[in-house]
Amino acid sequence: MVNKKFVIVIAIAAVAISFGVAAFASLVNRPPEASIGGGNPSSSVLLVHGLGEDASMWKKWEELLTNDGIQYHTITFQESDDKCGTALAHAVELGKRIDEILRSNPSGQVNIVGHSKGGIDARVYLANGTQSVANLIMIGTPNNGTPMAERTSLCAPAVWDTLPEANATKVGMNPNTRYYTIAGDWAKEVGGNPIIPGPDDGLVPVSSAESEGNFQSLGRTEHAHLELLSEEEYNLAQDVLLGRR
């Protein structure tokens, strides 16, 4: 009989490899930024990808947002071809993208949904005191860093912003924005990733994603880090995105 712990360790290795390989993938046919839907711009959603990824990771959410009649926008960071730019550089790009979105409605606001480091990028943007973002939902974001970042130099300098005690994880909160989290609690039956203390999604500790005392948790799913953009996570975020919370 195959040892479950061995299977989980192998799976963790595969996730970690994917985490790094993604940083060098999709350099051709970069997905264009999109603005879709007929909703009010004051309640539209900006979808922000994580390190080494691009806007194509949001396909499922695009479908679900459309079904709910919510206008959405995407961004693929341009600061570096491999999408491995710093949180500060990405924050500048976010500011420009949000300005574009709100140009037709200067008094409106957007909601940001960020996966992984995309949540840190959004936090750094929000630290400038802007009033343009009503809600930030962070999915699997290493808000207090992750020990996995200490084991790789792939996707630098982006990965440095996910180190424990990284300056980007310490930025202040914007009083004009409500902050929410969704975390993955993966492989609970064997205790998750043995490298990470406590429950985790294979890459990010739940304690870091939720950063208890700072943000409001919308809940947890049992998905691994790269699987956290399913309908289950969307359902946890839905009330916020529809203005019911």
Q: For each of these PLM feature ranges, what is it?
A:
Residues 1-16, 23:
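N-terminal Sec-pathway targeting helices
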Residues 23-245:
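Lipid deacylating catalytic domains
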